[in-house]
C-alpha cells in the first residue's frame, strides 16, 4: 500500500544520501514530503523559527508515515527533533533508517549516528525507539523493503491512541546502536514506527 511519507534528515550532511533514498522510487514523487531545494531552505531559515515550523507542519499534512533517515549527526539536529515530535503526536507512524552506509558522491560511507528516537518517550515512560522499528538502508535492503516498513510503522502507530503523545526523554536513556548485520530491525519491547527528511 502506497503511503504519503515525510522524510526527516540532516540536510547539510546527508542530503546526498537522502536523495538516493528519494530516487529509489519506492515512494512515488507525489507521495514524498520534506525534500526542499537548498536555496528555498535558506530562504525559509532567514524568516526565523516560526517560518520553519510552519513549513514542517505544512509538509506533514496528509502524510501518515515519517521516515527518519539517520546519519552521523541526525540525532542532534533541532529540526529533526521537532519533526519527530510533531509526527508522532499528529498520528504518523515512524520508522528509523540508518543511511550512513550509502556511498556519497565521492563513493565514501559515513559513521553511524545514534537513533534520535532514543530521545523521546511515551506518557507511560516507554522509550520511542523500543516502539518504532529501525533498519539500515543498505544492510536491510531499503530499496526493496521501504514500502513494507512504512506499512509496519502505520500499523504500529494505530495501536496507540491519539492521546498517547510523546515528549523528550531525559539524557540518561541508554542509546541503541545501528544494526551491524542484516536483520528485521531491533527486537521491540512494544511495536515500532516511520517517515520524513530533515535539514540543517
Model-derived segments and spans:
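Conserved N-terminal substructure of TIR/SEFIR domains
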Residues: 1-62, 158-200
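Conserved beta-strand-loop-alpha-helix hinge of the TIR/SEFIR fold
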Residues: 59-89, 93-103
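Non-catalytic, charged low-complexity extensions flanking SF2 helicase motor domains
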Residues: 145-157
Amino acid at each position: 500500500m502506497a503511503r504519503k511519507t515525510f522524510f526527516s534528515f540532516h540536510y547539510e550532511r546527508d542530503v546526498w544520501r537522502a536523495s538516493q533514498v528519494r530516487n529509489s522510487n519506492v515512494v512515488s514523487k507525489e507521495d514524498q514530503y520534506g525534500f526542499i531545494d537548498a536555496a528555498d531552505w535558506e530562504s525559509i531559515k532567514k524568516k526565523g523559527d516560526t517560518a520553519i515550523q510552519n513549513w514542517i507542519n505544512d509538509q506533514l499534512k496528509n502524510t501518515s508515515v515519517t521516515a527518519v533517515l539517520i546519519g552521523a549527526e541526525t540525532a542532534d539536529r533541532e529540526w529533526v527533533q521537532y519533526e519527530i515530535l510533531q509526527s508522532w503526536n499528529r498520528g504518523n507512524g515512524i520508522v528509523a533508517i540508518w543511511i550512513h552506509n550509502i556511498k556519497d558522491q565521492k563513493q565514501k560511507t559515513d559513521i553511524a549516528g545514534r537513533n534520535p528516537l532514543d530521545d523521546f518517550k511515551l506518557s507511560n515512560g516507554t522509550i520511542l525507539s523500543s516502539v518504532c522499528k529501525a533498519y539500515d538502508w543498505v544492510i536491510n535492503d531499503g530499496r526493496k523493503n521501504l514500502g513494507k516498513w512504512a506499512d509496519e510503522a502505520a500499523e504500529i502507530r494505530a495501536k496507540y491512541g491519539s492521546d498517547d503523545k510523546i515528549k523528550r526523554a531525559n539524557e540518561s536513556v541508554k542509546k541503541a546502536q545501528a544494526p551491524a548485520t542484516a536483520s528485521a530491525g531491533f527486537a521491540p519491547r512494544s511495536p515500532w514506527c516511520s517517515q520524513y527528511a530533515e535539514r540543517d
